């Protein structure tokens, strides 16, 4: 079990454990437009939905998970949290979910499966969770276009090397980047991840860099400020 300040995440049944990417997305995603409805696509343990339940007063926080064991785990984590009345997990793939959309969402978040590299681990479950063929970027962006409310935003974390491709695809659906944060492990390491927010409304795109640590377990003040509401030791 992974314990945060206001909730805990059981992760024994799912291949995707709590990791820096999920925590970053959950903590960084802008909420200044006061979302009432939120959708977490590919919820895994439910971590990001739980973080957004803590950060927002959204009355409807839906999560979507295709893997049965992860779905069960996310449901348990939601029920055991202080916000169980606002959280709900659907056991479905994105393609099924968008066939009959019942709601629009003010915020859609996704930590999509990646590793386009041709490599397999010994765990089929982990491969499903990590492979971009499990959820192509096109499918995610098209779904966001269908499901976002007029002033809604899409927030994702992806490998930095995929950023240009993702932005180009989003533009085809008239979704435009309004905030980009590029993430580096240390000041001298290469950029590993991109945090991106898209809107239907074109505006100046705010861009910055986030460095996680200056030395092993010596976190930058920016990273501490971002995550201190969640990590027990921050």
Curated annotation (Swiss-Prot):
UniProt keyword annotation of Nucleotide-binding present: no
Name a single GO biological process.
tRNA processing
Pfam name, any one: MTS
Q: Does the keyword S-adenosyl-L-methionine apply?
A: yes
**Where, per UniProt, does this protein localize?**
Cytoplasm
The family database entries (InterPro entries) matched by this protein are listed as:
DNA_methylase_N6_adenine_CS (IPR002052), SAM-dependent_MTases_sf (IPR029063), Small_mtfrase_dom (IPR007848), tRNA_Adenine-N(6)_MTase (IPR050210), tRNA_adenine-N6_MeTrfase (IPR022882)
Task: Spell out the reaction equation it catalyses.
Answer: adenosine(37) in tRNA1(Val) + S-adenosyl-L-methionine = N(6)-methyladenosine(37) in tRNA1(Val) + S-adenosyl-L-homocysteine + H(+)
Q: This chain belongs to which protein, by name?
A: tRNA1(Val) (adenine(37)-N6)-methyltransferase
Q: What is the lineage of its organism?
A: Bacteria, Pseudomonadati, Bacteroidota, Flavobacteriia, Flavobacteriales
């Amino acid at each position: 079990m992974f314990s945060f300040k206001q909730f805990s995440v059981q992760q024994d049944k799912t291949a995707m454990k709590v990791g820096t990417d999920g925590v970053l997305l959950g903590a960084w995603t802008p909420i200044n437009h006061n979302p009432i409805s939120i959708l977490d696509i590919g919820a895994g343990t439910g971590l990001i939905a739980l973080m957004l339940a803590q950060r927002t007063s959204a009355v409807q926080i839906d999560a979507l998970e295709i893997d049965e064991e992860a779905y069960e785990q996310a449901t348990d984590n939601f029920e055991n949290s202080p916000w169980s009345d606002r959280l709900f997990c659907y056991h479905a793939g994105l393609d099924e979910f968008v066939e009959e959309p019942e709601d629009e969402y003010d915020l859609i978040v996704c930590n999509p499966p990646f590793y386009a590299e041709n490599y397999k681990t010994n765990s089929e479950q982990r491969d499903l969770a990590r492979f971009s063929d499990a959820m192509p970027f096109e499918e995610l962006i098209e779904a966001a276009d269908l499901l976002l409310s007029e002033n809604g935003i899409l927030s994702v974390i992806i490998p930095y090397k995929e950023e240009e491709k993702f932005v180009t695809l989003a533009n085809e659906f008239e979704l435009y980047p309004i905030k980009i944060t590029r993430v580096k492990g240390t000041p001298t390491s290469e950029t590993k991840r991109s945090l991106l927010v898209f809107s239907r409304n074109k505006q100046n795109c705010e861009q910055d860099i986030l460095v996680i640590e200056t030395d092993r377990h010596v976190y930058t003040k920016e990273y501490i400020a971002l995550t201190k509401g969640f990590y027990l030791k921050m």
